[in-house]
From Swiss-Prot:
Organism of origin: Edwardsiella ictaluri (strain 93-146)
Subcellular location: Periplasm
Main location: periplasm
PANTHER family: CYTOCHROME C-552 (PTHR30633:SF0), CYTOCHROME C-552 RESPIRATORY NITRITE REDUCTASE (PTHR30633)
Keyword Heme: yes
EC number of the protein: 1.7.2.2
Name the UniProt record assigns to this protein: Cytochrome c-552
Superkingdom per UniProt: Bacteria
Function: Catalyzes the reduction of nitrite to ammonia, consuming six electrons in the process.
Catalytic activity: 6 Fe(III)-[cytochrome c] + NH4(+) + 2 H2O = 6 Fe(II)-[cytochrome c] + nitrite + 8 H(+)
Positions of Ca(2+) binding: 219-220, 265, 267
Binding positions (heme c 2): 164, 167-168, 305
Amino acid sequence: MIKVSNALQRILIGAALALFGGGAQAAAADSAAAAEKAPPKIEARNDRFAAPHPDQYASWKATAEQSEISDALAEDPRLVILWAGYAFAKDYNKPRGHAYALTDVRETLRTGAPMKPEDGPQPMACWSCKSPDVARVIAEQGEAAYFHGMWARGGPEIVNALGCADCHNTASDDFAAGKPALQLSRPYAARALEAIGKPFDKANRIDQQSMVCGQCHVEYYFSGKDKTVKFPWDQGTSVDEIEAYYDGIAFTDWVNPLSKAPMLKAQHPDYETWRAGIHGQNNISCVDCHMPKVQNAEGKLYTSHKIGNPFDSFEQTCRTCHTQDKATLQQTVAKRKQDVNEIKLKVEDQLVRAHFEAKAAWAAGASEAEMQPILTDIRHAQWRWDFSIASHGVHMHAPDVALRMLGTALDKAANARTQLVRVLANHGVNDAVPLPDISTKALAQQALGMNMQQFTQEKQTFLNTVVPEWEAQARSAGRLDH
């Protein structure tokens, strides 16, 4: 047996302790580093922030006062024809308060009546601008996993109304201290801003205020097999640049069954039109006009989260820059809205006729070669019209841009109809193509053979049975408090 001196024993024992102890310390350090890199858990339940941020929470909750449902199809039945074959022909209401974002996407006929998680018609992407649960699911499961599957799959997960964690890093020390802690909660929005050379983390506070709004108030499309959200900004954010992008990738939202034109549907390009308008050009942010600083009962200033019409808080919004009185500015805006609306209706009349005349041309025996340039004009005209009207505040944000877009839309629609006259004549049709009665929403939908009673009944069954199940599952899992 080899004898070891006491001194050598102490050296060996110390070395062993250092070796194994150091390993434990390294493991602990690695674990801490991993925890630091892990994204913070996102709290999607908005009422959890009522106590630390009472004024902001109360004003956010007050968006429920903006409850009016305004049926855009009933107001303008031409839209039914322009969106024939697309879900918007079933149902399209004007926007209302943020408190209703989740309710409205559940209740609209556009999302159908899926009775099972795998049922259609819409993809998961249709939740993307409706709830902070979207950011939570992306953080927990990854972006690809979030987008996979149909809209109904997300029902038990996406259960809290659009709120705090959509725009703020609610887990940060800054937010706890009462600072804005603005962040982009949608990774696809961050990528889009990078594409136009405006990375969020390098932007100033004013730019970031508009960027967080621009996560949702933008044009987007569903890309690839899993229908992931992408902003079409690779070539820029103007109507012409986005049109060129879509044409370059041969993207089509749907084919209008009347004309067989491959159509594009603009969503709500508020960020793009604001950016092009006088307010955006002068760095007046969305927050400056729609979320002003106001005083609470104790005289303390806070940012109102009752996002709405700037005229409702005139002294805190418009008055900070403009010298005119409220009535004068309201008249100016009303006149701009009237000007935009007049040309909008002219474009719609031309496009409605173009779709029906194209249908007649096909029926008369027109060839694809004859129709291709006509369908391109219809596609481009309606895209420019839609880009104008889908941005609901364009008459305020960028009226000159809206008028230019509508002017080019009118030209292209008229050009399509001029070509259609020749094609129809070549195939023996010399009389005017008759139009069905589309003077009301119901008549327009009837002209397309839409069974609205069936759609409505199926939706009501869905709301009465499936939605309560979603909410019960969410409460059971702790994702919904009430």
